[in-house]
Amino acid sequence: MADVSFWGGVGIIGSSKVLIEQDGWRVLLDFGLDFNPGGGLFRQGVTMRPSFQLLDRLKTGQIPLIPHIYRSDAMHGYPLAAGSDGKTALFVTHAHIDHIGLTGWVDPAIPIYCSPDTRRLMEALAVAGDVPEGYPPRLLEAGEESPINFGPFRVTRYSVDHDVVGASGYAVETENGVVAFTGDIRLHGRHPEKSLNFAQKVQGARALVIEGTTLSFGFQTSQRFETDVDDLFEEALKETPGLVLVTLYPRNLERVEAFMERARGVGRTILWPESMARMFQAWGLSDVQTWEASTSPNRVRQAPSQYVVVVQPDFLPWLLDLPLAGAVFVHANGEPLGVFDPKWELLQEWLKFLRVPFWSIGTGGHASPDDLNRLVELVRPDILFPLHSQEPDRLIPPPGVVRWLPQRGGRRYSLAGRN
């Protein structure tokens, strides 16, 4: 008999951890950190102890107490069974910290599978010094729609569309039917056909675990398309007489490439922070121009209408030296991500002080409520588990589909019958 339990993503956005068990074997889907900027016990200068980070997280309840997952050499005697049991595998949906951020603490004997692009992106991030907490994870590639047999399970990876390359959903075949997991998914991005293909391939699943991020934000009918974001960025480039300031998420590489192309098309050069530039170059992007503290300010002052400067919060003081008459700040889902981030208010204060107008042009990586319902209608599972949401009860299943609202902390849901 197969069971499903949830160890993250319950009542919060992000940090999904779905554990499927059968006959002593386990498949874990995603293993990320909670996204809680400015919150928790470690903030305002209080940091975790070097070499004791895993222990600090375990003792403060930040990560789940799942036995036989974590590295024994990082536990420091914590009373939880460590090391691999030889019967556990981890499958990661994509390279966002709330889905992959704990992989550095996974015992090295546990196989960690992901898409080829996710592995490649993680390698590029490592070149830039952006690595998961802990130790470098050993990632194994799972081919597109190429089943992997693991104990009694048969796990198949499908590409889906999200705001990061390499995003995947999974179908886990158990003795009681298929458990399908969307990971993070959308239909308004550049590749909606990928998400729709996944939904079609897992039609009739015993259970569908689906993200519900946008359910948390009240009534929404639609999301802006990615191509609309490109067009709005080009509009800003053309209509702004002076310097364009922009923030965007560097792991959204397709948007990065599109912005670079639009900027070149109107004769502007994008100046990237050094860490981003290193990552882009490791990924394989060409003609990546880096902000150089010794030379870039003079270049920008001489011809502000020929440049776009990528701004991160720690870059804000440099704006004091730049020509900002006729400038605009374009927010395209970069840092700070939104009003929930303490740095958001600080950014607004800086822009107000500098008298730079703010323009938000981004779009999210998560399906709208209407699109979530569309995906559920396409799959028509027996059981629906809404996850990765503050308001999962807002996802109303169609007739004939039973909705179970996951409870955190290891409660098992049997796939053999109703709980």
Where is each model-derived feature located?
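Short acidic-hydrophobic, aromatic-tinged amphipathic segments that line or gate anion-handling sites
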Residues: 137-147, 289-296, 403-407
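Short internal beta-strands
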Residues: 110-120, 209, 269-277, 329-333, ...
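A short, acidic, amphipathic alpha-helical segment used as a generic capping/interface helix at domain edges
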Residues: 78-80, 232-233, 313-322, 366-377
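Internal alpha/beta domain cores that form substrate/cofactor-binding pockets in large enzymes
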Residues: 336, 341, 357-419
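Short, surface-exposed connector motifs at secondary-structure boundaries
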Residues: 105-110, 178, 236-244, 264-266, ...
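Hard-cation-handling environments
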Residues: 220-318, 323, 387
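His/Asp/Glu-rich metal-coordinating catalytic cores
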Residues: 2-89, 98-253, 258
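Redox- and metal-dependent alpha/beta enzyme cores, enriched for Fe-S-associated oxidoreductases
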Residues: 315-355
